[in-house]
Design a protein with these regions (language model features):
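Terminal amphipathic alpha-helical/low-complexity segments used for targeting or macromolecular assembly
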Residues: 29-107
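Structural signal for interior beta-strand "rungs" in well-ordered beta-sheet cores
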Residues: 1-32
Length: 107
């Protein structure tokens, strides 16, 4: 089994074999993390600055080139300490990293 985070969007017929972070979009026959559900966040009434912070955190964690994934997650915890939604994503990721399924990462 895997977990699907809050407000995540999974494309129809997408195979998901890892945990999907909150606010993510996954598409493809073999599901791949494509980005954030920005439109869904805006439609849900989240402030533009909150959506922007989530996007910056996503880019830092999943698209960053420095360090390894786990180190970027730890650094993001400090960089985005004032944003509860980013902290929710980081909690989800850290829980997944301890589990058997792991978290889906962007390619």
């Amino acid at each position: 089994f895997c977990r699907i985070g809050r407000k995540a969007m999974i494309g129809g017929l997408s195979g998901v074999d890892r945990d999907v972070i909150p606010f993510a979009i996954v598409t493809g026959e073999r599901g791949k993390l494509r980005g954030l559900n920005v439109i869904g966040l805006k439609r849900s009434g989240y402030a533009p600055e909150v959506v922007k912070a989530i996007s910056r955190a996503f880019m830092y964690i999943f698209k960053g080139k420095e360090d390894n994934f786990e180190t970027r997650v730890q650094k993001a915890r400090k960089l985005f300490k004032d944003n509860d939604m980013v902290q929710e994503q980081l909690d989800f990721i850290e829980f997944s990293l301890k589990g058997r399924r792991n978290v889906m990462v962007a390619e």
